[in-house]
Amino acid sequence: MKKKDLGIIRSGLEFITLETLETLDEMRQEFSQIAMGIFSDEMFSKLFGRKPIKSYSERVRLASALKGVDFVFEVNDDTNLKALPPIYTPSTEPKEYHIAYVPGTFDLLHEGHLQHLLMCRDMCDILVVGVNSDKLVWGNKGKRTQMSENDRLEIVHNLTFVDYVYLVETNDKSVANNWVKKNLGSPIDVILMGSDLKGNKNEDNPNGIPIVFTDRDPKFQETNSSSYWRKKFKELNTNE
């Protein structure tokens, strides 16, 4: 059956969930292109009777980061559909590294994650993201994630600028390096981490692979942490 030209999804998109991805998959079966409309702050308040917990620009960037979305537009009282600029455009410029490995938990994917991953993407030809398992997070931090490892893995896998995703079950980076060599035919050239991980056991690297730290915008340091958004997520679900 021939697909229809354009499918449109309208959403508040405060968080990317498996339901978001399932909706995109269903739409992809029927339409050759998908447009996602994000409610403006004013429209969100009008529809849901409260302010969104993430700004319009943050919600747009989440939508733009998804592989199944061809373009994003603002949903407001204006009926005109105007496509917004994409969050990421592939570059043909030579990169500093061939294969970069980025480990992390990526719970309740947020702007801080996007900033970090986009910086990493600009530094390499191939971006491999390691998503920490539930067991590893508990062992390292003594707390549980809001989203399961399968959900977090699937969400990161569906980001347009991520090439490969790997479930991390140990702090031993040689295991990740072996996985990359087996699946990509070459070893990791660099490990990229957020600067908030400096000075702890994440820096231990007996394999000699360079570790480079990226800096988040200090202006958004508080709201760019998963612990902040776990609290907001719980408050949101308690009030509904």
Language-model features, listed with the residues they occupy:
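Nucleotidyltransferase catalytic core that binds NTPs
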Residues: 1-240
